[in-house]
């Protein structure tokens, strides 16, 4: 997508070229005189990024990073900050990922965006499970998708990355994770202590030459780092070329489709994953190593299911796929009724044309 207005005015073409290898075809990008800093969080005062999400406890970082980039491009294309919310789980599983394997092939996921696209979160909400399970998006999800026309790899050189960041939008980055990233609180990150613990995929949304770093959006929740972001040093040397030499930073381009579908939006306010409810009082779950489903909410005593809804006329509450309660009266809530053990609480919201889901697993103690 060729960026217009403000972004184009800050670029002055020079004669040298930077090579960018494309997943479906080859392409070149002219080297540019770049501004000292740039951020998709501040385009003429507008923040086109969406809220930081939390992938835990699942290994779905590839699709969280892709969707973070895509959501920003959607808002920029419409010149509207309307908080689109795409289904990372749909993209992860339908593109061939599994929790047992611990990843989805990033190139397969990008190709899936070209061939099929990704629907909104209401078609396939993230249940925050750490295991594989049967999955299926809502019927008609194909009519609610956003697609891209191409993707490619960016040369692993600072100026090439910064230029592509302006030209194409937020970039998807593969990198190695060391123990000290978990305790990051601020400043420009370079690996200093601890062993390598694995790989991760995140989204570059900006850069700052004065600090010598990229601003990176993570998917570990807004309570980590700098409200869910971190600054990565240009010279950190953490790029992971898992897909061959020269891979590690991906761009996507040519966003189109149903960017703003007429659908209800529904999200649980309580119960939510990773939290415990004791006679209505809520706190983050402790003793997480106990032999109960990881991340599932824990319920002790009376608890009401409470929702955040938009564009909604009616909701249905289900426990383990059994319809328990229907209401057309906002605010939509229901006193949870379930026996001891693990359960799945699903809500289905309707407007005049479509339906959307949200799901949370929970364990009832009493």
Which residues are covered by each model-predicted region?
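Disulfide-stabilized cysteine-rich extracellular repeat microdomains
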Residues: 18, 209, 221, 237, ...
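N-terminal compositionally biased, intrinsically disordered segments and leader/signal-like regions
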Residues: 7-10, 17-18, 146, 194, ...
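Secretory targeting signatures
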Residues: 1-25
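Catalytic-core signature of thiol
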Residues: 25-270
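Long, low-complexity serine/threonine/glycine- and acidic-rich segments characteristic of extracellular
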Residues: 23, 264-366
């Amino acid at each position: 997508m060729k960026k217009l207005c403000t972004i184009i005015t800050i670029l002055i073409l020079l004669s040298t070229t930077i090579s960018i290898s494309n997943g479906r075809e080859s392409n070149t990008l002219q080297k540019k005189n770049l501004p000292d800093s740039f951020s998709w969080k501040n385009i003429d005062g507008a923040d086109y990024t969406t809220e930081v999400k939390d992938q835990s406890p699942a290994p779905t970082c590839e699709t969280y990073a892709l969707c973070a980039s895509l959501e920003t491009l959607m808002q920029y294309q419409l010149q509207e900050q309307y908080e689109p919310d795409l289904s990372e789980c749909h993209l992860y599983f339908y593109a061939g990922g599994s929790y047992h394997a611990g990843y989805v092939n990033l190139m397969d996921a990008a190709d899936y965006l070209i061939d099929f696209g990704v629907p909104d979160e209401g078609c396939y909400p993230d249940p925050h499970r750490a295991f594989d399970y049967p999955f299926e998006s809502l019927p008609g999800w194909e009519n609610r998708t956003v697609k891209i026309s191409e993707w490619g790899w960016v040369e692993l050189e600072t100026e090439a990355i910064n230029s592509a960041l302006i030209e194409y939008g937020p970039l998807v980055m593969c990198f190695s994770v060391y123990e000290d990233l978990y305790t990051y609180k601020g400043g420009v990150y370079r690996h200093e202590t601890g062993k390598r613990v694995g790989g991760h995929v995140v989204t570059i949304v900006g850069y700052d030459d004065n600090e010598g770093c990229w601003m990176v959006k993570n998917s570990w929740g807004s309570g980590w780092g700098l409200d869910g972001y971190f600054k990565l040093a240009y010279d950190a040397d953490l790029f992971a070329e898992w897909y061959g030499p020269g891979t590690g930073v991906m761009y996507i381009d040519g966003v189109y489709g149903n960017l703003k579908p007429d659908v209800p939006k529904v999200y649980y306010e309580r119960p939510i994953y990773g939290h415990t409810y004791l006679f209505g009082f809520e706190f983050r779950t402790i003793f997480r190593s106990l032999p109960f489903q990881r991340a599932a909410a824990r319920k002790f005593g009376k608890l009401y299911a409470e929702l955040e809804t938009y564009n909604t006329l009616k909701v249905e509450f289900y426990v383990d796929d059994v319809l328990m309660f229907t209401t057309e009266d906002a605010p939509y809530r229901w006193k949870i009724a379930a026996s001891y053990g693990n359960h799945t609480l699903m809500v289905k919201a309707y407007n005049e044309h479509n339906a959307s889901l949200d799901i949370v697993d929970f364990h009832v103690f009493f």
